[in-house]
Structure formats: C-alpha cells, structure tokens
C-alpha cells in the first residue's frame, strides 16, 4: 500500500458502503460496514469497488440522461455514455470532481468516503436499538484488516459499549494483525475459497498458504467456537465437490466441531463491474444454485468430517 495511504489509514478509514438491518452477516440484526482495499484479486469478486485501496469513480448508467455535460471534461471530448464502459483513464481527478459536481443526474459518484472513527461510530450508533437480541456490527470489505489501525480502533470503541462485533475476512494478512484484533472480536467469518494452492494463485492472485496458517491459528485459539469458515460457490472456480472435500477435511482435522458455511453464488455483482468500467469474469451471468444443489454441496462437506454445516441458499 502506498505510504501516503498508510498515513491516512492511521487517522481515518475509507468505507464504500454501510448496510443496515443486515441479517446474513452474523447473528441478529446488524449494521455491516464495508472497508475499502483488498490484497487479493478474485476474478469473481462480489464487491469490485472494494478491491482498490484508493477512492475511485463509478458511472451509474441507468441514471445518465445524456446531457453531455461530462463531454467538456473528457480528454477525448466524448461523453461517458459513448463508451461501453466508463474508464477513469479518460479523466483527470480534477475532471472527475468537476463531473460529479456538475452532473444533474448524479450519474458519476465516488465509490467511497473518508471517515474518522468518531464519525463512523456516530453513524453506527443510530442503529444501536436494533443490536439487542444478539445483533451488532460486522466489518466486511474488501479486506477489513487492510485498514488494521482503523478497524481495531473501531472494534475497541464498540466493545466499550458492549456491542457485538464480527468481521468477514479472507485472512490473507499477517497473523500478528489477527492476534491483535481477536480480543475485540466476538465472531470471525473466514473464507477459504480454493484449497489447491496453484488454482488459488491463478484465480485470486495470491497463494493460500498464509490463509491456511491463519485458519489453523483461529481454529486452535480460545475463540475457535466463534469462528465460521466459509466457501462461496462460484461456478467454474470454487463450486466443485473435490474442492469442498479437501477444505472440509482440512478444517475438521484442525477442530472437529468447526462451523462451515457454504454460500450460494451472488449474481448481483455483474452490474457493479459495469459501473466500475471493469470486465466481469462471466460472459453470461450464471444463476443461483438450486436448494438441492446447495444441499448436495453440504452433503459432501458432511461426508468429509463437517458436523456443523450452514447452507446459505
């Protein structure tokens, strides 16, 4: 990460979304905060706007009224909608800001905002009444631990108020960071997407050796009962029984009562790639897996040592 960004993250955080009344990101009713930046480059990423640690512009094609105001700020003197995809390379940062300020339809917006821990806490506490009955706050991304100082500061502030905390992580982080944050976390949702290391490198851009090391640390820690290992079912990449078999065997050998969650494919990500001017990995967006298909994936996990299976269909 560039040094200037590291300095910013020491004082503030960059968030790209806050999802209120979330029911799939932990127990109870939750507020999920999405932190920007990820060291992995999963080709199917469900939140492509969260990969870069820097703030980027998005083009909302459905809002555009083709007024051509953006044209005068383009290096090529072409309106944004005249390209199949919006490319920020055609605009300087100053030009993008001018478009955001002048577009009458708000068709171009930055994908994230800079906030202090106190500002974010104030925003979160608007929902505090809903955190009773096991609700709380979940940090997602991107990779939340990329902004480790900001994340840990937020976790401490929430625990001071006895608010339940959770994190969704791909675990491609230094183990010492995990050790520092764990005392302030009630639940950890940790991804292991692909067991084979070469395939993992090919489709995520990184080795999974550190990820496996961190999973081993978590499943041997005092909080192992509050760790849920997850695998998203991505057609062509992760959704095969051999992958589930190997992951299930690996994690159940580390902790026999491990909780393993199998997540259904999310077809809603495709539109995000269009907004970000990026190409999606699927030419034709696959559908959700059926309930029967998801149960079959779960059966494979159970046959390979998993006692506590969670299926999100």
Annotate each PLM feature:
Residues 2-27, 235-313:
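Auxiliary Fe-S-binding modules of radical SAM enzymes
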Residues 5, 107-112, 200-204:
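Acidic/glycine-enriched edge-of-secondary-structure segments
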Residues 15-69, 86-94:
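N-terminal pre-triad scaffold of radical SAM enzymes
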Residues 26-27, 34, 52, 56-61, ...:
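N-terminal-biased segments
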Residues 43-50, 69-85, 98-114:
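Iron-sulfur cluster-binding cysteine motifs and their immediate structural context
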Residues 106, 160-161, 304:
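Conserved dinucleotide-binding and phosphotransfer motif residues
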Residues 118-275:
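Conserved AdoMet/S-adenosylmethionine-binding subsite of the radical SAM
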């Amino acid at each position: 990460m560039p040094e200037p960004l590291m300095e910013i993250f020491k004082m503030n955080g960059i968030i790209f979304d806050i999802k209120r009344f979330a029911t799939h990101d932990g127990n109870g009713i939750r507020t999920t905060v999405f932190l920007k930046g990820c060291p992995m480059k999963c080709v199917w990423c469900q939140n492509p706007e969260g990969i870069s640690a820097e703030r980027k512009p998005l083009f909302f094609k459905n809002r555009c009224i083709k007024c051509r105001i953006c044209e005068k700020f383009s290096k090529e003197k072409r309106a944004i909608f005249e390209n199949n995809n919006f490319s920020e390379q055609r605009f300087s940062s100053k030009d993008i800001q001018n478009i955001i300020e002048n577009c009458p339809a708000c068709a171009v917006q930055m994908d994230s905002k800079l906030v202090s821990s106190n500002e974010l806490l104030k925003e979160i506490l608007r929902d505090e009444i809903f955190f009773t009955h096991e609700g709380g706050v979940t940090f997602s991304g991107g990779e939340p631990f990329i902004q480790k100082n900001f994340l840990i500061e937020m976790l401490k502030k929430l625990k001071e108020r006895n608010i339940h905390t959770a994190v969704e992580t791909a675990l491609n982080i230094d183990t010492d960071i995990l050790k520092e944050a764990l005392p302030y976390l009630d639940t950890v949702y940790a991804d292991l997407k692909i067991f084979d290391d070469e395939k993992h490198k090919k489709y995520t851009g990184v080795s999974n050796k550190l990820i496996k090391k961190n999973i081993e640390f978590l499943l041997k820690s005092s909080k192992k009962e509050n760790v849920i290992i997850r695998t998203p079912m991505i057609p062509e990449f992760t959704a095969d029984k051999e992958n589930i078999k190997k992951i299930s065997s690996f994690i159940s050998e580390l902790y026999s009562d491990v909780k393993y969650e199998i997540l259904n494919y999310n077809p809603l990500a495709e539109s995000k790639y269009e907004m970000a001017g990026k190409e999606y990995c699927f030419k034709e967006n696959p559908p959700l897996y059926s309930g029967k298909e998801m149960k079959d994936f779960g059966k494979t996990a159970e046959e390979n040592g998993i006692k506590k299976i969670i299926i999100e269909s």
